[in-house]
Amino acid sequence: MASLKAWVKAGRPRTLPLAITCVLIGAAISLSPSDISLDQLPDARFYTVLGLTLLTVIYLQVLANFANDYGDFKKGTDGPERSDRAMASGEISEKEMKRALVVTSTKAFVVGCATVLFALDFDLAKSAITLFLITLGCSSIY
């Protein structure tokens, strides 16, 4: 079983600030100048959606890092000489990484769906159509 240190290394935390910054800049841009007042802060839904979006983007970034580590290992791009990669260095087995990819994908999907539901104010019709179109778009890329 891989150590927590190996999983943190595979998740590459130094890549997270860029993803988080993109979401925070988008959130700041979404606020109108009248919203930026200490007297009247945005409503709780804004912060809920922001928090869920941040969680989603963190899961997606970690998922991308895991997938990159796995793919480079399988193709042979990362060999035993790459001690900075968790799979190539032998700290994480192929079976463990596959399981982590499934778990992280599932978490990202669930939190992403929750984000869409909150963002559309639980309007199930809009949410279902939006999620269907996103799924259709993703499947067309694949």
Language model region names:
Residues 1-9:
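Short, Lys/Arg-rich, polar N-terminal cytosolic tail immediately upstream
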Residues 8, 16-20, 47-55, 98-102, ...:
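Hydrophobic alpha-helical transmembrane segments
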Residues 10-31, 106:
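The first (N-terminal) embedded transmembrane alpha-helix
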Residues 11, 72, 93:
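Residue-level signal for inorganic ion chemistry
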Residues 25, 38-67, 129-140:
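Membrane-embedded alpha-helical segments that form the functional core of polytopic membrane enzymes
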Residues 31-38, 69, 73-77, 117-121:
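Transmembrane helix-loop junctions in multipass membrane proteins, especially transporters and channels
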Residues 59-83:
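Acidic (Asp/Glu-rich) catalytic motifs at the cytosolic membrane interface
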Residues 85-142:
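Intramembrane alpha-helical segments
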